[in-house]
Amino acid sequence: MGRTLENKQQIVTEIKSLLNDSEMAVVLDYKGLTIKEMSDLRSRLQTTNGICKVTKNSLMRKAIDGDSNWNDLESLLTGTNAFVLIKEDVGGAVKAIQSFQKDTKKSETKGALFEGRLLSNSEIKEIASLPSKEVLMAKIAGALNGVATKIAISINEVPSGLARSLKQHSEKPES
């Protein structure tokens, strides 16, 4: 028994909602993966706030229809696809996918869409090499803190230098 029209509409609505919350979509060919391996991929993605969704290409096509951010995804909608929808930690999720692919040697990345732009496999690998958002924020905070510390030391040094000069001048014997 096939899916009812109402059921298909619910799936399309769910996919649209997931896409609205996502920053990036990675399309994987999942042919040959077992249920256990798909569960493994899903659990790896949970820590990075990514979702692996297996759905028919026709339903994904309906979900992206008219959405300029996701329209280019249509060129990847052939064959057996699993869609990894990434909400926040894009680099971490791509690392999780690559780690999974390295371990299973079964799944292939067809492509990805990030901020309305199709990415090649080499660009996807570059994203994986980026540090996480938290690491970048820590680096920026450290750099800003260093600048603030130097400014505070410089500001404090002017009155201290003036005080030392006045003290030296007052202790100098009058000639």
UniProtKB/Swiss-Prot annotation:
Q: Does the keyword Metal-binding apply?
A: no
Pfam families the UniProt entry points to: Ribosomal_L10 (PF00466)
Gene Ontology CC annotations of this record = ribonucleoprotein complex; ribosome
Q: Where are the annotated coiled coils located?
A: none
In terms of superkingdom, the source organism counts as Bacteria
GO MF: large ribosomal subunit rRNA binding
* Keywords carried by this UniProt record: Ribonucleoprotein, Ribosomal protein, RNA-binding, rRNA-binding
Q: Which GO terms describe its biological process?
A: translation
Q: Which family does it belong to?
A: Belongs to the universal ribosomal protein uL10 family.
Q: Which NCBIfam families match?
A: PRK00099.1-1
Subunit text = Part of the ribosomal stalk of the 50S ribosomal subunit. The N-terminus interacts with L11 and the large rRNA to form the base of the stalk. The C-terminus forms an elongated spine to which L12 dimers bind in a sequential fashion forming a multimeric L10(L12)X complex.
Reported function: Forms part of the ribosomal stalk, playing a central role in the interaction of the ribosome with GTP-bound translation factors.
Name the UniProt record assigns to this protein: Large ribosomal subunit protein uL10
Q: From which organism does this entry originate? A: Prochlorococcus marinus (strain MIT 9312)
Biological classification of the source: Bacteria, Bacillati, Cyanobacteriota, Cyanophyceae, Synechococcales
